[in-house]
Amino acid sequence: SVPGAEAGDRLITRGALESGGLAAADSEALIVRTLPNEASKRTRDWSAGPLPAYFTREAMHAIVAAGIEHLLVDSPSIDRTHDQGYLTGHRIFWGLEDESTDAPRRPEATVTEMIFVPDSTPDGLYALSLQVPPFATDAAPSRPLLYPLESV
């Protein structure tokens, strides 16, 4: 069965996302910046030290229910580092059942991992240029660019 959270795991929960305004957002993309937001994230050896934060199943279901098509995170995976290959968060995001090898139900949805958003970039609404090359594969590099939106 799908492994659950273990003592000491750092979780990104549905409640945390809702506290951050997920339910009120009318956006296609969501950027999640975990704390502490240290510049060392850019060069960190993620296999050393404590495991990085990851999304709970409930958090992933909330993201899908909110209509998020593009999820960008500052950790190496939306799933627990040692999840025995289940990739539960990825499967939920793309609309796949556990252990399914079917084509995703949300083929246009994207996950971008290991981004870095400095503290000098305030929380808020941005236009996102994701810039993903047209590779026919399950993973491709992306270059997300954010442009602040101003109310008129």
Feature annotation, model-predicted:
Residues 1-152:
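Active-/binding-site microenvironments in catalytic and ligand-binding cores
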